[in-house]
C-alpha cells in the first residue's frame, strides 16, 4: 500500500469509512492530447508519481523498464507507466487510448491518454467522447501545431467545454516567460474560431522535471496561477445531461423468469421516478414506471448516468434500441439529419455510400446524400470537397432507412452521437454527432406485398453491395 493511501485510510478511521468517502467524491474524466512527442504520457506519469499513486513494486519495475526502453537517459521515464503496449515502448509513442485512475483528497479522476500521431486520430476521438475536460499539451519549442488545432476542434466538437492548455517542456526553453506568452497569444487567436462558450486556461510546466504539475515551480516565479493538479481539482463541471429531458435507450430486455420483465440500460439524461408516465419510441405507446431496479435494490428515483432496469405497469412491445422518454415530451423521429463526421477509414467517405450506423442500442442503415463541407484544421474554414478523407472532419447530410429518435449532440451526446460501421468488414469507420434534424421523414406507412418483402430480403442478404434499402424499416418506423 502506498504512503498517501495508508494515511488517507487512517485519517478516515478505517477502510470502510474511507471507501464511503470515496463514493461521495466528485469524478472528473479528462484526456491528454496534442501533437507527437509533446509529453502526454510523461505528464500522466508525473501526475501519478507526484500524487503518490504508484506502488513500490511498480516503481521498481519502472526503474528496470527505464533502463531498457527509456528515452530520458538516467532519469525515470514516467511515460512507461502509461505506454503499456510493446510497440509503444519500442517506438516511444502512444498508439492506443490508455486509461488510468487516481484520486486526491478532493476528487476522483479517470485519465485518457490519447495518441498524438495523425494516423491515430480515431483513437483520440474515442477517448474524448466520454471526457469533461481536455489537457492540450504544446511543446514550448514548437508552439501550436496542426495536431494541436485538430485535437482542439475535435474536443469542442465532442462537447468538451473546459480546455487546459499545458505548455510543456519549459525546462528546454530556460523557463522563458516570453515563450509562454507568445504561445498563449497564438492559441487564443486560433481559439476565437472554436465553437461554443469555452473555459480555456494556460499552465506552463515541465512534465519531466515536475514544474507546476502537482507543486509550484521555483523556476517560474513569474507564473502566479494554479498548478495543473489544482486546476483539475477545482474546475467546476456542469454536465448538461443532468438538465436535459429524460432519455432512456433500452440496451437489453431482462426476462429471467415468467414473473419479471424489465428494460435495462443507462439513463442517458434527466431523471425518472416510480409512477412517472413514459412514452416508447418509435411506437409511441405509453405506460408508467412500476419499479426502478438496480444492483443495490429498488429505488424511487434514478438520475442521469445510472445503470438501471425499468419495470412498467403494462406489457407492451419494447425491444433493444427503443427509446423511453417522459410522456409529455415531444420527440419526432427523423429520417434525415446533418451530421458532423470524424472519418476514420482509409477509404474516403463519399456521397452515395451506405453504412450501418449504431446509435445507443439502435442499429440501422444510412446513406450519405451529400457532403456540405470539410473543415480546414489550420484556420477552421469550410471548403467544398467531393469526399472526406482519413481523419477528415466535415458536415454530412444523411438519410436513415427508418425514422430514428435523435437529439442534437450538444444537448445529449448519447442520443445524438453515432458510429459508422462498414457493412462487409464490420469495422467502425467513423464517428458522427447530430448537428441538425430534418423531420420531413415522417411519411405515411407504405404497404408492400409478401413477394416484394421476400425479394427485398433476398437482395439485401445476398447482394449487400447493391445498397438496397430495408423496406420494413419504413413500415416499422411509421407504425
UniProtKB/Swiss-Prot annotation:
Residues annotated as domain tr-type G: 25-239
Ligand binding (GTP): 34-41, 113-117, 168-171
EC number: 2.7.7.4
Region (G2): 92-96
UniProt KW keywords: ATP-binding, GTP-binding, Nucleotide-binding, Nucleotidyltransferase, Transferase
One biological process term in Gene Ontology: sulfate assimilation
SUPFAM superfamilies in the record: EF-Tu/eEF-1alpha/eIF2-gamma C-terminal domain, P-loop containing nucleoside triphosphate hydrolases, Translation proteins
UniProt keyword annotation of Nucleotide-binding present: yes
Protein name in UniProt: Sulfate adenylyltransferase subunit 1
